[in-house]
A protein has these predicted regions:
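Mixed-charge, Lys/Arg-rich low-complexity intrinsically disordered regions
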Residues: 1-17
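Basic/aromatic-rich interaction segments and small domains that mediate binding to polyanionic partners
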Residues: 27-52, 58
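Intrinsically disordered, low-complexity, charged/polar segments
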Residues: 2-6, 49-68
Length: 68
């Protein structure tokens, strides 16, 4: 998990922007591309495609999705 975040929230996959930090199956990923087929996400160990309709994003200190 990344250093400091202020909680999580579930959002529709279509609203996730590239660079947004998210959690999927207990791991932390960075969103890459959001296409009709799914949300491409990666971390330093693996890449994955998330096809679920909603994803869990990490929040910053202002309660907004954390983007790196």
């Amino acid at each position: 998990m990344i250093g400091m975040h202020y909680g999580t929230t579930s959002v529709p996959r279509s609203e996730v922007l590239p660079g947004t930090m998210l959690q999927h199956h207990g791991k932390t990923y960075r969103a890459s591309a959001n296409v009709e087929k799914g949300l491409y996400a990666f971390n330093i160990f693996e890449k994955t495609i998330i096809k679920s309709d909603s994803v869990v994003v990490l929040l910053n200190e202002r309660g907004e999705p954390m983007v790196h």
